[in-house]
Amino acid sequence: MSGGTTGERPFSDIVTSIRYWVIHTVTIPSLFVAGWLFVSTGLAYDVFGTPRPDEYFTEERQEVPIINQRFSTN
């Protein structure tokens, strides 16, 4: 069974091209900076609805919350 060609460029040609590295020297660090800003600004907490570190325990409630009726419909 002979494999055919898909018409795509070989990966080795892509990685060794100047154009690849010109594009990716900008995009790869940009992704890291965007992720760092997403987390450091607190936007990740707002988007995913998780409590911020200072919101786990409030002034009124300092003990660990225990769930007794987790699957109750009441």
Curated annotation (Swiss-Prot):
Protein name: Cytochrome b559 subunit alpha
Organism phylogeny: Eukaryota, Glaucocystophyceae, Cyanophoraceae, Cyanophora
Organism: Cyanophora paradoxa
Any single GO BP term: photosynthetic electron transport chain
Function, as annotated: This b-type cytochrome is tightly associated with the reaction center of photosystem II (PSII). PSII is a light-driven water:plastoquinone oxidoreductase that uses light energy to abstract electrons from H(2)O, generating O(2) and a proton gradient subsequently used for ATP formation. It consists of a core antenna complex that captures photons, and an electron transfer chain that converts photonic excitation into a charge separation.
Alphabetized SUPFAM superfamilies for the sequence: Cytochrome b559 subunits
Pfam families: Cytochrom_B559, Cytochrom_B559a
Record's cofactor remark: With its partner (PsbF) binds heme. PSII binds additional chlorophylls, carotenoids and specific lipids.
Compartments, record wording: Plastid, Cyanelle thylakoid membrane
Membrane topology: Single-pass membrane protein
